[in-house]
Amino acid sequence: MVVSAALVGAMLPSAFSEEATDAVEAKLTEMTLREKVGQLFWVRPEALDFSLNPEKKKLTQTMRQNLEQYPVGGIVVFKGNIQDESQLSSLIADFQSASKIPMIVAVDEEGGSVARLANHEAFSLPKYKSARDIGATGDPEQARQMGRTIGSYLRAYGFNLDFAPVADVDSNPANPVIGRRAYSTDAQQAAQMVTAAVEGFHEAGMLCTVKHFPGHGDTGQDSHYGTATSYKTWEEMKATEMLPFEAGIAAGVDVVMTAHITTPNATADGLPASLSYTMITERLRGELGFQGVIVTDALGMNAIKKYFAPAESAVAALCAGVDVLLMPSDLRAAFDGVIRAVEDGTLSEERLNESVRRILTLKQKAGLDLRGSAAAEQPLPEKTPDTKCSFSDWLKKLWSGADSAA
């Protein structure tokens, strides 16, 4: 595939004009509770096929019907969902046409070992050895060019979000999962590369993500398989792990992905960072000032699903301040759990609206059209509603249930 020169120079539109804000509020006003909750879930295509043998490479009639009942806000494409260029473009187009609200279509395309398209045998795309090799050049322009190149070919196929670049610092030699996916063992150098990469993605018109907050590079375990822990204090994290994340935020990154790591010396709650109000709301939102979309790492990873039921982890993440629940192990259970949490008051609807606003704003920034049956003009809220979540009450219920089960 030849990447069009027009795509390479495509900049992301601004999503913060008064007109854009009005469109978000208009859409929010007309949405049902299930539609709002659906925006919070980004899943693999097969999550919408509840049979044992889903057809992963196309949108089936069954999946279309399930999408009506579980109207997710985005899909995440993996190698198993891809056959060739034509099929991939059709898959994405079919999902977009089937969704009432345009979807975020995301992929892990970091360059190096994690590149669902470039490493696929059916594609002839630019390949990179690793982020580490880019960082080793000491030239941020190399990171910018990689972001621009990857963003351009993803956009050509219909993607609008890349779960890249990696902002972790590879500070623990025993780490089994980050390694060469990180730009450097040096936080300052990693920060320079992250800044340039974010700028490169945006120059290509591609939304991008820094991950895995608050830094998976310092752990000695892989959260895909179980508990992973960083023993650094918050002050130590601010001196190292936070530098690339702060750089990405300053560069205007669109999304921050959380890690399921526990940080016992940085927070007192004992929870994985993805479920920690201290780490998400107080630190990422408060101290670092990030106002964009926060997405969990996959909730189906063992660091979460071994200890929390799908509904529990979904609601706890929202109570912590997360916006998007990525790939729960059971979409229906997690989705229905969030519905129940709103209905019983554990999660206020305005807390829900807070995240939906951010997600819709992100979609506008991607150039997706939110218009439809929404009225052209809707009044904005006259007061600031209660956005609290009964977080302590929810945790009491969660741990009480765990004790009862034990």
Where are these regions (language model features)?
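Substrate-binding cleft of extracellular glycoside hydrolase catalytic domains
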Residues: 103-147
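Second-shell residues forming the walls of enzyme active-site clefts
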Residues: 27-32, 50-62, 81-103, 113-115, ...
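Preference for extracellular/luminal or secreted protein segments
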Residues: 7-65, 70, 286-287, 305-406
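Bacterial N-terminal signal peptides
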Residues: 2-10, 108
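A short aromatic-anchored loop/beta-hairpin motif
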Residues: 65-79, 264-265
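Divalent metal-dependent hydrolysis catalytic cores, especially in the metallo-beta-lactamase
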Residues: 72-78, 160-168, 321-325
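Conserved beta-strand positions in the central sheet of alpha/beta enzyme cores
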Residues: 42, 76, 162-163, 209, ...
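A substrate-binding/cap region within the structured catalytic cores of diverse enzymes
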Residues: 129-159, 164-198, 202
